[in-house]
Amino acid sequence: MLDGLRDAVRKFLGSSDYEKAVNEFIKELQIILIKADVNVRLVKDLTDRIKKRITEEKPPSAIEKREWFISIVYDELSRLFGGDKEPEVMPKKLPYIIMLVGVQGSGKTTTSGKLALFYKKKGYKVGLVAADIYRPAAYEQLIQIGQQINIPVYGEPGNKNPIEIATNGLEKFLKEKMNIVIIDTAGRHGYGEEASLLEEMKSMYDKIHPDEVILVIDASIGQKAYDLASRFHQASPIGSLIVSKMDGTAKGGGALSAVIATGAQIKFIGTGEKLDELEVFNPRRFVSRLLGLGDIESIIEKIKSVEDYENLEKRMEDVISGKTKLTLRDIYKQLIALRKMGPLGKIFQMLPGAGILSQVPEEQLKLGEEKIRTFMAIMNSMTYKELDNPSIIDKARMRRIAKGAGVTVEEVKELLKQYQMTNNLLKMVKRRKGLAKLFGGSNQ
């Protein structure tokens, strides 16, 4: 799945015929996702949304069409895998009790160790409870994992009552002031026996009252994950999921998209066999890797910068028409947008009259860049109240602002003077427009 999408993106970005390349890319995307066991309806919905957006939307000025198209694909794939919802993985209270459930073969016991190591690295004291009594090697496996990562494991090999083991282990670790206790429960049920698994989960839950229940799902089951995740999501209001073995299957995309379609939340994905190969599931980061675009965020940032600037242009039209007043906050936002778009020389080339502007000497451009940095530092030292109404700034505040920005009082005065001159100029423009209307003249 990964290589297929990366190759498709590379081929698209290197093509000469944009329209043809778009159609070919969408077809290839459909094939790749269906091969990855993503539900056909989800794939159709995804590609329909992409087609709709490229028909109805227009790329921002100064953005190359291909980059814009890939940013739309990135947005829609991210939405398929959960959008902007990055999970909260840090405990909201201490001690924090986590109960891990999952069918046999899901990688639940190994995931218990991975999760314990993740929290240990974050500075928490963690304990593991081996409450899986049905798989003969489960206790020994967890003991070995605990030794590898230097985390204590509680178990009672002769006891056949998992609830009793969990209760005793929890009591012991809470006495030892553990911050997080992870309980590895029984995994004796196969896929298709979700009802039995959830019934057992409920019995354990009612006795130990964990703060969180996490279901571990093997990525290789693909879109079959939908039924299990759906039932689990309905049965456990405090539940989340870990999708394990993402590295060993082509069906990972199917499993992830199926889980997301249920409304359940994926917290982590297992990316390898090693105990440190567990990562917080960030949909956008995941999609960025799928597309093989390490710099996708820079493309998105570039598009956002141009859109921000276009929004500012609209704001300035409102200022000139008298609908609103220009503030230092407006000027600050303009400078931020300009800085994101690149050096002054590059920006001048994008503006009308670029031929004349391109003749501005390099030294003058450098001075302009320095002045922008100085003015931004000054505005960073101001309060929101001062940015919205600079007239309240007295001499004492000027000194404080200058000190905070690492500039001179004269430079603060210069910024305020420039702001006042700009406002006066805008008043003149408004007056001229008013006179033109009064005498039936042109607004130009």
Curated annotation (Swiss-Prot):
GO terms for molecular function: 7S RNA binding; ATP hydrolysis activity; GTP binding; GTPase activity. GO terms for biological process: SRP-dependent cotranslational protein targeting to membrane. The keyword ATP-binding does not apply. InterPro entries: AAA+_ATPase (IPR003593), P-loop_NTPase (IPR027417), Signal_recog_part_SRP54_M_sf (IPR036891), Signal_recog_particl_SRP54_hlx (IPR013822), Signal_recog_particle_SRP54_M (IPR004125), SRP/SRP_N (IPR036225), SRP54 (IPR022941), SRP54_GTPase_dom (IPR000897). Its EC number is 3.6.5.4. It comes from the Archaea. GO terms for cellular component: signal recognition particle. It catalyses: GTP + H2O = GDP + phosphate + H(+). GTP binds at residues 102-109, 184-188, 244-247. Signal peptide: none annotated. Keywords: Cytoplasm, GTP-binding, Hydrolase, Nucleotide-binding, Ribonucleoprotein, RNA-binding, Signal recognition particle. Its main location: cytoplasm. It is found in: Cytoplasm. Composed of three domains: the N-terminal N domain, which is responsible for interactions with the ribosome, the central G domain, which binds GTP, and the C-terminal M domain, which binds the RNA and the signal sequence of the RNC. Involved in targeting and insertion of nascent membrane proteins into the cytoplasmic membrane. Binds to the hydrophobic signal sequence of the ribosome-nascent chain (RNC) as it emerges from the ribosomes. The SRP-RNC complex is then targeted to the cytoplasmic membrane where it interacts with the SRP receptor FtsY. Part of the signal recognition particle protein translocation system, which is composed of SRP and FtsY. Archaeal SRP consists of a 7S RNA molecule of 300 nucleotides and two protein subunits: SRP54 and SRP19. This is Signal recognition particle 54 kDa protein. It comes from Sulfolobus acidocaldarius (strain ATCC 33909 / DSM 639 / JCM 8929 / NBRC 15157 / NCIMB 11770). The gene is srp54.
